Amino acid sequence: TTRLDEIKSLGTTVLWLMPIYEQGVENAVSSPYCVKDYKKLNAGYGTLDDVKTLVARAHEKGMRVIFDWVANHTSWDNAWMQNKTWYTQDANGNIISPEGMGWADVADLNYDNVDMRAAMLEAMKYWIEVVDIDGYRCDYAEGVPHDFWQQAINELKTIKGDELLMLAEGSETTLFADGFDLVY
C-alpha cells in the first residue's frame, strides 16, 4: 500500500493481482496457477487484512482491483480432490490434467458436475463479498464452458452491479456474449 500513490501517478486505473491463492505442492512447478485453496491467500503475500487494506486504499485513490482467477484446474492437493467426480477422468477413472496443454502440475475440473460449479462460484463470490474486489481476469477462459461464465458473471453482478470488471484470457469473441468486458 505504500506505493499506491506512485502507481496511481502512472495513470493506473486497475490493479490486476496475479493468482495470490494458496499454491499446491504435489506435482508442483512453482506456478501460482496451481491453486490449492481458492479461499486462502498464499502466505507470502500477507494476510487477509493486508489484502482488504490494499483494496480499500486503492478504491480511495480511484483504482479498481481485480484478481486473476484460475477456473479450469486445481492443484493435485486441493481439498476438492476428495470429490473425484469434480474432475475430468480418463477411461480408467483416473483424474487427468487438462488435455493437450502439458500442464502436469494441475488437475482438470469437470464442469458437468453441478456441485463443483457451485463451489467455484461460491469461491468467486467470496473475494468480492469479503475483500470488495472489483472483478477477475479469468485465466484460460476458453477452457471453461460458456454457460458457466454466463451464470457466474450474472450472479457476480448481483453483488457488484455494472461495476463488475471481467477480463477473459482467450481469443474467442463468443466470450463477450458470456458477459466478459474484455477478451485478449
Regions found by a protein language model. Give the residues of each.
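Solvent-exposed loop/turn segments at secondary-structure junctions
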Residues: 21-24, 71-76, 142-143, 171-174
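Active-site cleft segment of glycoside hydrolase catalytic domains centered on the general acid/base Glu
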Residues: 86-118, 140-157
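Active-site-proximal helices and loops of the catalytic beta/alpha 8
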Residues: 55, 59, 122-123, 129, ...
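Aromatic- and acidic-residue-enriched segments that line the glycan-binding/catalytic groove
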Residues: 26-37, 71-99, 180-184
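N-terminal structural segment of carbohydrate-active enzymes
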Residues: 1-64, 72
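Hydrophobic faces of well-ordered beta-strands that scaffold small-molecule active sites
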Residues: 15-17, 65-67, 136, 166-168
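The substrate-binding groove and active-site-proximal loops of carbohydrate-active enzymes
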Residues: 1, 34-48, 102-117, 134-143
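An active-site-proximal structural segment forming one wall of the substrate-binding cleft
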Residues: 4-10, 51-65, 69-70, 79-88, ...
